């Protein structure tokens, strides 16, 4: 009796399902997620493979039969440019004329010697037409010998050296060394305004110490002198420093001087470093979206081509890709931004001599002045 009841309990349902037990095993949430991911990956792989297979089929060219070449190979004849009259006049006295019965194999050597004499004649001649003609022959001639190339390089080096060679410079004395800040002086400065390179603009800094003249006797720029600079442009891709041009300095006593000097860091390196924001997600999120949209268009084009509607969908695909590229181009080309905090130390690299002779005057003070008055 009991066996009959157990057998009835485990009998197959009338619907024919073999898994009719109500205590069957269920999939957990993580297992469902894994299965869904696998299915999604397989679907994307099939779409990508289908698009790639179509691209390969479109790019494949029909195989052609190559007929065997039964004719012997003959090299192309060497074209020798005609000699100019000026070159011929310089070459004719030095080129030996071979006898008429000389074999044909000597023609190549005769051409080589002729090129050597042409190079020597051009090197010794200073006329511009000969040089221009030789340059044209160099462009058109195929048989350029190593000797001729060395002559060209030597000629160019001599011309460049003679053009850029500077005359001898004479030493001079500074007219007012006590009142001058010479070129190359590095002046420290503390930023009063923060820097953000999103837009061009002006910056301001204050000198934390006195700046003296060349003799280190007279203070020319007092502590607290304000300096105004200009940021002319922002950063480009790959830049990590911003260029600031310092325009003018004003002392607490209202003495002003034009600097026109570039910025530098504490060690004198050009430009100012800072915190650089490359806008990675803003730039590459658009790139990833563009790639996804193009992949979707390619997959849809493959499907439409296989179903017979490829002609109409290809035009839609091209228009969609152009619209997407136009919309996302500005997002992908976002330039980086450099930010520098207020209070950071920067440097001013003096680019020219600063003369304060017309601003300050020297006079004797203290004991020196009293001694002079006694002598007088």
Swiss-Prot record:
Keywords: Cell inner membrane, Cell membrane, Crown gall tumor, Membrane, Plasmid, Transmembrane, Transmembrane helix. The gene is virB10. NCBIfam families: PRK13855.1, T4SS_VirB10. This is Protein virB10. The chain crosses the membrane at residues 33-50. It comes from Rhizobium radiobacter (Agrobacterium tumefaciens). VirB proteins are suggested to act at the bacterial surface and there play an important role in directing T-DNA transfer to plant cells. Disulfide bonds: none annotated. It comes from the Bacteria.
């Amino acid at each position: 009796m009991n066996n009959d009841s157990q057998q009835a309990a485990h009998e197959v349902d009338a619907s024919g399902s073999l898994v009719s037990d109500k205590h069957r095993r269920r999939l957990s949430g993580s297992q469902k997620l894994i299965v869904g991911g696998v299915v999604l990956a397989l679907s994307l792989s099939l779409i990508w493979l289908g698009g790639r297979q179509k691209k390969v089929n479109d790019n494949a060219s029909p195989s052609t039969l190559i007929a065997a070449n039964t004719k012997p190979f003959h090299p192309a004849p060497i074209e020798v440019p005609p000699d100019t009259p000026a070159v011929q006049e310089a070459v004719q006295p030095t080129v030996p004329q071979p006898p008429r019965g000389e074999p044909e194999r000597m023609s190549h050597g005769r051409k080589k010697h002729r090129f050597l004499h042409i190079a020597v004649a051009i090197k010794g001649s200073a006329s511009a037409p000969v040089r221009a003609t030789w340059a044209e022959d160099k462009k058109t001639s195929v048989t350029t010998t190593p000797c001729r190339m060395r002559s060209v390089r030597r000629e160019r080096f001599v011309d460049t050296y003679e053009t850029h060679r500077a005359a001898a410079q004479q030493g001079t004395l500074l007219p007012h060394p006590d009142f001058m800040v010479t070129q190359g002086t590095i002046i420290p400065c503390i930023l009063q305004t923060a820097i953000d390179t999103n837009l061009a603009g002006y910056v301001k800094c204050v000198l934390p110490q006195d700046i003296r003249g060349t003799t280190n006797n007279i203070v020319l720029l007092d502590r607290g002198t304000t300096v105004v600079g200009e940021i002319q442009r922002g950063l480009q891709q790959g830049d990590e420093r911003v260029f600031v041009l310092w325009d003018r300095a004003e002392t607490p006593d209202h003495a002003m001087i034009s600097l026109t000097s570039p910025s530098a860091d504490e060690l004198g390196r050009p430009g100012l470093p800072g915190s650089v924001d490359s806008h990675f997600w803003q730039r590459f999120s658009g790139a990833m979206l563009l790639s996804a949209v193009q992949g979707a268009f390619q997959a849809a084009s493959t499907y439409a081509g296989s179903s017979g509607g490829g002609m109409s969908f290809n035009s839609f695909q091209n228009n969609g890709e152009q619209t997407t590229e136009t919309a996302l181009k500005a997002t992908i080309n976002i330039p980086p931004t450099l930010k520098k905090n207020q209070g950071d130390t920067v440097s001013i690299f003096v680019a020219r001599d600063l003369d304060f002779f017309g601003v300050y005057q020297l006079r004797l003070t203290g004991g020196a002045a009293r001694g002079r008055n006694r002598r007088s």
